[in-house]
Regions:
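Short arginine-rich
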Residues: 73-77
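Short S/T/G/P-rich N-terminal loop/turn motif that feeds into the first structured element of a domain
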Residues: 1-51, 55-68, 78-105
Length: 105
């Protein structure tokens, strides 16, 4: 399983709007993509930062989403974020939520 972490700068006073957009617009878009498993978002209280972590079956699924779906997500989020988000991709090593064990265990 792979995850994409996207760090974003929120516009002033837009945390509630960001959360609404993720819940009502972004998650339904993500569910249409092959290999999508989960989305977890975090908003830093008192700061204008948010982190979105999407989980994918394979690295290829995550990369395909990055090529074909991510631009639509950015466009949808443009009302709540500013600047260019920073993206990092990781292989998931452990997760109690996703019932994943470390490789080699």
């Amino acid at each position: 399983m792979f995850t994409r972490h996207v760090m974003m700068k929120l516009r002033a006073n837009s945390a509630a709007e960001f959360t609404r957009i993720i819940e009502n617009e972004i998650i339904p878009l993500l569910r249409k993509h092959k290999g999508f498993r989960d989305e977890v978002t975090f908003v830093a209280p008192g700061r204008s930062e948010a982190l979105a972590s999407s989980f994918w079956d394979t690295k290829e699924d995550a990369e395909a989403y990055g090529r074909w779906g991510y631009q639509e997500v950015l466009k949808t989020l443009s009302k709540a974020i500013e600047g260019t988000p920073k993206i990092e991709t990781f292989e998931v090593a452990n997760s109690t939520f996703h019932k994943i064990a470390a490789k080699g265990a």
